[in-house]
């Protein structure tokens, strides 16, 4: 929703991210809906205080243009991170998923449903921590927020959309957990579980086709991780894990043990291997060697 620009805050001497929206570019009811969704994003994003979410600094309007000023996140989005590491280490996938569970647990406690969790909405920072972006399509569960746009289209991305969301039905934390299952499957296999030439075709597969177990594509993936992904991708929400907390607990035995060596940037295992360590982590960076005498 809208465009995001890197900007400079002259007052506080810092880089920020600015999301811009021009409702005048959309006519009639759609413009009103975009305004409402933008205001909701500002309020929703400001409600949740968690290190895995961007901080909102300011919001307002200027010359018919709505703006949201947010924390600038230095890193790579998860889609690019995946493209640069093929195959994606399963330990990295577990570490990303565990961090996402912590964020989702905080978001669901508000209670808010993200409804558009996907790699493009996740940033991996230089220190390996993960940040979730774009609560702009979030549904605040204790309000009468519509589940469909005024055009009748479900809000979200078809490749990551839970069956109940695709049908325009009630959504809940279980909806985000399905998207998390799609995301983990993509990290492990390199592709989302369901593809198609049209959005409708993709949604049909979410509704009626079983996903391919990831160990058929990557035998080195632990059986327990494959089983968790299949649970997350259950068509029936009642067959999925009951919460992000439960999902985290199932990932916990698969997380790397503390003290194992790490030092490279954008390594999502680092927060578990070296919790609270400074970044750059000088203890993990070899000291420069003196140059040889001429």
Identify the function of each model-found stretch:
Residues 63-77, 81, 85:
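Conserved short submotifs of the Hanks-type protein kinase catalytic core
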Residues 26-33, 126-170, 197:
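Activation segment of protein kinases
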Residues 22-47:
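AlphaC helix of the eukaryotic protein kinase fold
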Residues 59:
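Activation-segment/catalytic-loop signature of the eukaryotic protein kinase fold
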Residues 96-97:
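Activation segment signature within eukaryotic-like protein kinase domains
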Residues 159-262:
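C-terminal lobe helix-coil module of Hanks-type protein kinase domains
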Residues 100-112:
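Protein kinase catalytic-loop region centered on the HRD/HxD motif
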Residues 238-292:
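Juxtacatalytic C-terminal regulatory tail of Ser/Thr protein kinases
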